[in-house]
Amino acid sequence: MGWQRPDGRQPQELRSHQFQRHFTQFALGSVLAQAGQTQVLCTVSFKEGVPKFLEGTGQGWLTAEYRMLPSATRPRQEREFLKLSGRTQEIQRLIGRSLRSAVDLSLLGECTLIVDADVLQADAGTRSLAITGGYIALVDALSALLQQGVLRKSPLRHQVAAVSVGLIDDEPYLDLSYAEDVAASVDFNVVMTGSGQFIEVQGTAEMGSFDRGTLDRLLDVARQGIQELIEIQQRVLAPSHE
């Protein structure tokens, strides 16, 4: 008998995903994203100016910041003040890279989009949920900028979503909870476009190693899950959900 998922899901079943748009008042785009017990507040803001390496190029930029509330995990974690942990820096760079791929930066002018991902509650999958929810917030932010006349043309290039997948008892499991993440011998974070192109694949063997066949199995399961998330994004962004 294989691994029994704590929440009763099938091995290749996503957690229940919910995205509440326009969650805060002042951000151009804001989404409360939930996947099972994991909750991430994703907001998108806009400011004039770009990093120094882009000054004078006429090109814009998108960057991301990621933080966890102290009570997002048990036990309470200390806030990160003067120095960010390596994990935090890695995750916010991943979010930034993933969502930058969705935008034609040349259409922004010398302006910057800032994606903030704040974890309210963590039961694994926070970086994946931040990307999937962050995309929805990004769409709303760009729509607001178009309505305000700040942008003349939408810079959106494609949809982006992400999911985790892991190997437990030699079987692929989709969208891992914390208990499953700990139990997995191999775990991946996969980011893809709406057309099925890969943006980023992060994979690690926690114990031992894995072969090419295992890699392909995990990516196939991740691709299936991301396609479901792409469809959820489309439903959430439909005019009837305004």
Curated annotation (Swiss-Prot):
GO MF, one example: tRNA binding
Residues spanning the membrane: none
Pfam families registered for this protein in UniProt: RNase_PH (PF01138), RNase_PH_C (PF03725)
GO biological process, one term: rRNA processing
Catalysis: reaction(s): tRNA(n+1) + phosphate = tRNA(n) + a ribonucleoside 5'-diphosphate
Catalytic EC class: transferase
Keywords: Nucleotidyltransferase, RNA-binding, rRNA processing, Transferase, tRNA processing, tRNA-binding
UniProt xrefs under Gene3D superfamilies: GHMP Kinase, N-terminal domain
UniProt keyword annotation of Plastid present: no
InterPro entries: ExoRNase_PH_dom1, ExoRNase_PH_dom2, ExoRNase_PH_dom2_sf, PNPase/RNase_PH_dom_sf, Ribosomal_Su5_D2-typ_SF, RNase_PH, RNase_PH_bac-type, RNase_PH_CS
EC number: 2.7.7.56
rRNA processing found in the keyword field: yes
Binding residues annotated for phosphate, in chain numbering: R87, G125, T126, R127
Subunit structure: Homohexameric ring arranged as a trimer of dimers.
Function as written in the Swiss-Prot or TrEMBL entry: Phosphorolytic 3'-5' exoribonuclease that plays an important role in tRNA 3'-end maturation. Removes nucleotide residues following the 3'-CCA terminus of tRNAs; can also add nucleotides to the ends of RNA molecules by using nucleoside diphosphates as substrates, but this may not be physiologically important. Probably plays a role in initiation of 16S rRNA degradation (leading to ribosome degradation) during starvation.
Family per record: Belongs to the RNase PH family.
Protein name per Swiss-Prot or TrEMBL: Ribonuclease PH
Organism: Thermosynechococcus vestitus (strain NIES-2133 / IAM M-273 / BP-1)
